[in-house]
Amino acid sequence: FARGGSNKYLVEMMEEGLVEYILDGQTFDLEGVRSMRENANHVWTSPFTSYNYHSKGNFAGLVDVVVLGATEVDVNFNANVVTHSDGYLLHGIGGWQNCLFAKTTILPIPLFRDRIPVVVDEVTTLCGPGELIDVIVTERGIAINPKRTDLIEKTKNSDLPIYSIEELKEEAESICGKPQKISFSDEVVAAINWVDGTVIDVVRKVKE
């Protein structure tokens, strides 16, 4: 099965027999809407069950591969999805953390945004621990978490542009320069909870 948000590409995969079911939480285009209307195997699901760590319907950890976004990744493969590199809040985390329990987690990210490196020494806000993030894909190369020796072995003799995460960070800094550190006040404006409710980081107010 594939977990949606669905779009025409996911629908085509199901209709061509590449996946048997789409378990959908939202549709991103009219092809997804059409498929949900016409295909019995295109099933509506609620994120309150499918992504809920405490729910019997939670299937996020059953997924073989998940592809997610991130605003920052650091050299320890920790990821940020809730603030930008300027320290300001972007949006909520949603089911992003729950998806990290998939067998392989891939984060496709640009190496930099608006001349600001995305691969950094330390993320501004910790949302996902590096031990759950397996592959970083950028337009200038791919980094595989050293803990995933199986993936490193399988890609050893491939033509893929594989680098260490440190090499990607250095590439970003050679183009953009090393970013200045943000000045924060002591005021806490948000808490970052892990899926079990544990607070793993906080967001502090940016000094004007």
Annotate each PLM feature.
Residues F1-G5, D24-Q26:
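Active-site nucleophile and cofactor-binding loops and adjacent substrate-binding regions
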Residues N7-Y9:
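Glycine-rich loop(s) and the adjacent beta-strand/alpha-helix scaffold that form part
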Residues V11-E12, L18-E208:
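Conserved phosphate- and dinucleotide-binding cores of soluble alpha/beta proteins
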